[in-house]
Curated annotation (Swiss-Prot):
Residues 140-159 have a biased composition (Basic and acidic residues). It comes from Drosophila soonae (Fruit fly). Gap class segmentation protein that controls development of head structures. GO terms for molecular function: DNA binding; zinc ion binding. The keyword Metal-binding applies. The keyword Protein transport does not apply. Belongs to the hunchback C2H2-type zinc-finger protein family. It is found in: Nucleus. This is Protein hunchback.
Length: 159
């Protein structure tokens, strides 16, 4: 009987680790959301919705201080997210800086943006107007898809 108790205790170790891992996954999910709302917010005059999304995201952000406990990880998660829409990356960084009450977010976005500029200078130099518009048009379905695939992943994770 005792041995089974100990086995249960030992089994709980990886479970708690798994929980932490799940939070990590959730953090990644939130970064996806942020990337999406930012690519939309690059032209806020088109629709007021992105600002709402950003506000929602920031509220979630404050509820989950867990994400910032490991700073290097959000950095890694944020890099690919910013890499995809590189024309809007600069706008994303400034948007975050203006709206975010947490300066950490802005700092991380800025760092990522610096790295991004160093990695892909030609793409940043290209006139940002037309790519931003095309980005806007294809960002809508992509946003839906991203959010849906992410939430299903989360569900799988929790089940």
């Amino acid at each position: 009987w005792y041995s089974s108790m100990f086995a249960a205790n030992i089994k709980q170790e990886p479970i708690s680790h798994h929980n932490h891992h799940h939070h990590h996954h959730h953090g990644h999910h939130q970064h996806q959301q942020r990337h999406n709302s930012n690519s939309n917010a690059s032209s806020p005059h088109q629709s007021p919705l992105p600002n709402l999304q950003l506000e929602q995201y920031l509220k979630q952000q404050q509820q989950q201080p867990l994400m910032w406990s490991g700073l290097p990880n959000p950095m890694q998660t944020i890099m690919p997210a910013n890499m995809r829409p590189s024309p809007t990356a600069a706008t994303a960084a400034t948007t975050t800086e203006l709206c975010a009450p947490t300066t950490t977010v802005a700092a991380i976005a800025m760092q990522a943006n610096d790295k991004l500029q160093a990695l892909t200078p030609p793409m940043d130099v290209t006139p940002p107007k037309s790519p931003a518009k095309s980005q806007q048009s294809c960002a809508e379905p992509e946003k839906e898809h991203d959010l849906m695939s992410n939430s299903s992943e989360d569900m799988k994770y929790m089940a």
